[in-house]
Amino acid sequence: MDFNILYSFVSNKTFTDVEIVLIDEINRVNMNVHKAVLASSSQYFLNLFTKFSETNKSTITIRVRDSQISSDIICSFYGQIVDSTNYPDWKYTLLKYQCLDYFSLDYNIDILTGLKIPSEGFDLLLETANTIGYRNEINKLIAKNIPDNYDLSIFSDEFLGSLRKYICKHNIITANFKSINIYDVITGNKLSSLSLNNNFSHVCKVGKNIIAIVYYCADKIFLFDLVSRDVIDTLHNLDIQSSCDMTAICYIKSLNHLVTANSNNQLIVWDLTTRQIIKIKKVNRLINRLIANHTIITDYNLFISIGYNESILVWDKNYTISKGIDSPNKITTYSASGRELILANARYIKIFDIDEGKILYKTNNDTFRTPYDIINICDNSYILFDSDNEPICYLIYDWKNVSKIRLNRSKKNYDNIFCKKFPPESVNYSANDTNSNILIVVTDYHTVYAQINGKKYGPFVVKPNNIAGVFFVKDKKATNLLNSINDLIKHN
């Protein structure tokens, strides 16, 4: 069938046998159409033409929510894609779903979850929800688009309670070499994207909504505001000749300091409050990684630097070395308590007490596979991965009960409740905050999983692919909304 010819019969009133008059509060649309086409496309029209008083009428008037969109829908029965309005996309979509529901037509409710609705359209969203029914997808959309300072008291406690599960205080940020992208952790929808001028070598979160970015072959550190999506400052010092070849970067939250290392074996400390360099230290080895201690604040255990063969230096608040650990490790990370280091290679796994300066526990790595990464998945639980990002073993280490059980290990044992929610597949990048019980995991360089306060989000695929880093940021609006909802429910 040639739908274009069929549609021309409508324009030319050829073989038409009924006139449909669509009326809304403002507009009126007249269409000469074919009963057979409408009845075969919609149960509503089949019933209208066969079961009611309109059966033998040549002109039928129908009162609809929007006459123009309703006419577009009837045109779609003739294989046409028509938009006869000048509405913004969000308005057209909401009204279209009301009209589709009125005509008893099927629609894909998932499309709604990606809509961004301005404050002036929120009442239309609620109207649409009342028309097509409150369901998970609609509730997600409502939760995401509630305007600031909206009067939440119009909602019942039951409905407010149902909205809470669709509101998350955090968003996910992915770095893709040339772009920074922010995603809604619940829906997986991209909220915003920031294009970069060049590929970056390092990216680090340095505040609630600030990230530091170092480009390849650049001698500057750019501070980006994720809210304004703009460079708010540039850190640069002409006296540091090798700063263009930075090898590592970390953020000391308690002091608001940014620590960088470069190929000239220098450790450089920036005060982000004054945007000035406050310390330049010469070290006798190339630093490959810097890891900040975000769990506890001590004068002597601020962060660690890791050099060749995982040789470790522990740094104090004056940026002097408080301890050195020379051990042939392949991977190193802080424990959940921040008081110990977990060290591992192809032969063993060790727990090193930083305060005491000694090994608390050592066990053989009888997988004989060299670990290349370790992820603190929650509290005192860890997964070690090999060079192919495949899991090697699963660790439980509880520093509070170290005298009773120091280390439990079983190869490929993923029966922990957390791990049940994440497939034990290849992991490329992760970000966590054990204090806030947050973990984000990236697999296959594009698939994101998250767990926040024990609740699973994802998986969802992000674009562009080839994620080079991942972290999370608090959503101020969502946090305020949750607080308002909780206060209302508490006082009702």
From Swiss-Prot:
This is Putative BTB/POZ domain and WD-repeat protein R786. Belongs to the mimivirus BTB/WD family. Keywords: Repeat, WD repeat. InterPro entries: BTB/POZ_dom (IPR000210), SKP1/BTB/POZ_sf (IPR011333), WD40/YVTN_repeat-like_dom_sf (IPR015943), WD40_repeat_dom_sf (IPR036322). Residues 16-86 form the BTB domain. Signal peptide: none annotated. It comes from Acanthamoeba polyphaga mimivirus. CDD domains: BTB_POZ_ZBTB_KLHL-like. The keyword Repeat applies. It comes from the Viruses. The keyword RNA-binding does not apply. WD repeats lie at residues 241-281, 286-325. Pfam families: BTB (PF00651).
